[in-house]
């Protein structure tokens, strides 16, 4: 069976594609590192490539050439050849790296100012050390700096350099003001070209040379541009040189508050309609930044006012004490005086009683004598005093009645008084509601407005420009109460009758009556007279009346003005005679 199979395979032709050289599809290719056994290394001829410098002891004759030879480090100082790690310092190659080569000065110190000088020219002055902060006069190497006067050549060179720099600035400023899109501003100079024509169409004759003048074509300055030029954005400028500062200090709360800038808030515009708090609005106003200085005169003025007030209060207190002492002293003197008057009055009363008793005894003895006593009718002064008191009483009664009538005077009576007074103002009539305007249509306008002949043009009543009275108050004046002429003033019954008649008439219904009065006014007791007030008296304690009673009275008490009839005041002699 095996021999049959082998014979069958041998009889078949050799396959054209064995699959060894065919490319494996992408999805079937192995991924990741290829693992090769130790027995397959020699068959596959794999070469291991090493990067970086060889280890120490194996560097004899080795020279770093590529960037991989340096690894992650720099140049090798033991190899005395030109080395360019990261292609730094190599001329003719454009580097894109921002790394700087470490440079040292004569003393072997690293020159850190190379970072600040990067991107600037060699003539640029860059201050990058502490020595640059010290003034020239205070430096240690002051003697090394040359302060000699420059030569003429140096002055001329510097002046020419300055002049060129200023000229370039001026030209740039002038060119910036000139229009850039105006064509035909400057025309180039014409160009002359020598032209020798070639042989054409088999013509072998000699041709003369021609000199051609090439002139730039005239352009229309008002022609719009044909192409749109787009400016390329400018690249970032060179970094500015570092500025040396003092070491940073931690800000205090006062410094932070001083550097806090409030947001600007306008007092006039608020297009968004925000509700800004009042403290934020005041903070943006800047009032807190101003130092408020209060004049010391305010404190002095307040202190002066306080002192003056205290002094015035002290004076008032002392004055009140003095017045109280004076009042007490005066009261004591008055009591002493009253006591003396009372003692004197008692003594006089006792003396008068003794004198009356003696006179009474003498009269009784005289009446018993046979001689008749003829009584003389002498005019008495008491009758005159009685008539005078009656007249005063009558006048007072008339004044009281007049005041009563005036207090109960109605509106009509007041109009009568106003009519009697010629110079009375019309505003009082208007306030009383009695100056009623006329309701006729003729008095509603002025006749002069209608070109009537009764106006001022006719010459009638030139002093009075109005033809009708302003108010017609004659009806109210005619209804005024007028007392009768034959009424006697002293007639009390007639006066009382007229008073009762006036009281019964409803004189206030003419002007209208209030619908509702004050609360509690209906329950009040009706008043039969005018409102009476207590009059202020100069002698509230009755001391003066007491003195008058003591000094003027004969021991009898009288209240008010009391009339004593003449019959009751007869002398005791007459009563004795009657008996």
Curated annotation (Swiss-Prot):
Biased composition (Low complexity): 366-379
Example GO biological process: mRNA splicing, via spliceosome
GO cellular component terms attached to this protein's record: post-mRNA release spliceosomal complex; Prp19 complex
Location (main, coarse): nucleus
Domain of life, source organism: Eukaryota
Subunit annotation: Associated with the spliceosome.
Name assigned to this protein: Pre-mRNA-processing protein 45
């Amino acid at each position: 069976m095996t021999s049959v199979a082998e014979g069958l395979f041998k009889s078949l032709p050799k396959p054209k594609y064995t699959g060894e050289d065919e490319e494996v599809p992408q999805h079937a290719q192995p991924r990741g590192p290829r693992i090769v056994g130790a027995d397959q290394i020699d068959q596959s001829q794999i070469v291991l490539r090493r990067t970086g410098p060889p280890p120490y002891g194996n560097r004899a004759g080795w020279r770093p050439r590529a960037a991989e030879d340096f690894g992650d480090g720099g140049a090798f100082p033991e190899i005395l050849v030109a080395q360019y790690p990261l292609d730094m310092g190599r001329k003719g190659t454009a580097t894109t790296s921002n790394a700087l080569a470490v440079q040292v000065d004569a003393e072997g110190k690293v020159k850190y100012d190379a970072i600040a000088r990067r991107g600037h020219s060699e003539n640029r002055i860059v201050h990058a050390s502490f020595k640059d902060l010290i003034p020239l006069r205070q430096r240690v190497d002051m003697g090394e700096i040359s302060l000699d006067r420059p030569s003429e050549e140096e002055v001329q060179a510097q002046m020419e350099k300055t002049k060129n720099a200023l000229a370039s600035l001026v030209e740039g400023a002038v060119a910036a003001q000139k229009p850039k899109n105006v064509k035909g501003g400057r025309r180039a100079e014409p160009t002359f070209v020598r032209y020798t024509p070639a042989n054409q169409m088999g013509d072998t004759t000699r041709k003369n040379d021609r000199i051609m003048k090439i002139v730039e074509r005239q352009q229309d300055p008002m022609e719009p541009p044909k192409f749109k030029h787009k400016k390329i954005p400018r690249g970032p400028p060179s970094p500015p040189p570092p500025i040396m500062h003092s070491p940073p200090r931690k800000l205090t709360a006062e410094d932070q508050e001083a550097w806090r800038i409030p947001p600007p808030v306008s007092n006039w515009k608020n297009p968004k309609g925000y509700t800004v708090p009042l403290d934020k609005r005041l903070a943006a106003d800047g009032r807190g930044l101003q130092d408020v200085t209060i004049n010391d005169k305010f404190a002095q003025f307040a202190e002066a006012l306080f002192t003056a007030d205290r002094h015035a209060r002290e004076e008032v207190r002392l004055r009140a004490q003095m017045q109280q002492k004076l009042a007490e002293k005066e009261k004591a003197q008055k009591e002493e005086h009253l006591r003396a008057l009372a003692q004197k009055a008692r003594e006089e009363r006792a003396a008068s009683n003794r004198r009356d008793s003696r006179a009474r005894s003498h009269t009784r003895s005289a009446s018993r004598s046979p001689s008749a006593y003829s009584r003389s009718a002498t005019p008495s002064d008491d009758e005159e005093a009685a008539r005078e008191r009656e007249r005063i009483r009558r006048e007072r009664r008339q004044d009281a009645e007049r005041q009563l009538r005036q207090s109960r005077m109605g509106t009509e009576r007041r109009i009568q008084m106003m009519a009697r007074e010629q110079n009375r103002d019309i505003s009082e009539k208007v306030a009383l509601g009695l100056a009623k305007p006329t309701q006729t249509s003729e008095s509603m306008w002025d006749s002069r407005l209608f070109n009537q002949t009764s106006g001022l043009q006719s010459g009638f009543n030139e002093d009075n420009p109005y033809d009708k009275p302003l108010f017609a108050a004659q009806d109210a004046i005619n209804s005024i109460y007028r007392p009768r002429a034959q009424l006697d003033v002293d007639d009390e019954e007639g006066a009382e009758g007229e008073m009762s008649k006036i009281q019964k008439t409803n004189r206030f219904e003419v002007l209208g009556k209030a619908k509702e009065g004050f609360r509690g006014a209906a329950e009040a007791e009706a008043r039969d007279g005018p409102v009476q007030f207590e009059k202020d008296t100069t002698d509230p304690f009755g001391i003066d009346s007491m003195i008058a009673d003591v000094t003027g009275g004969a021991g009898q008490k009288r209240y008010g003005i009391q009339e004593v009839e003449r019959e009751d005041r007869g002398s005791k002699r007459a009563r004795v005679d009657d008996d």
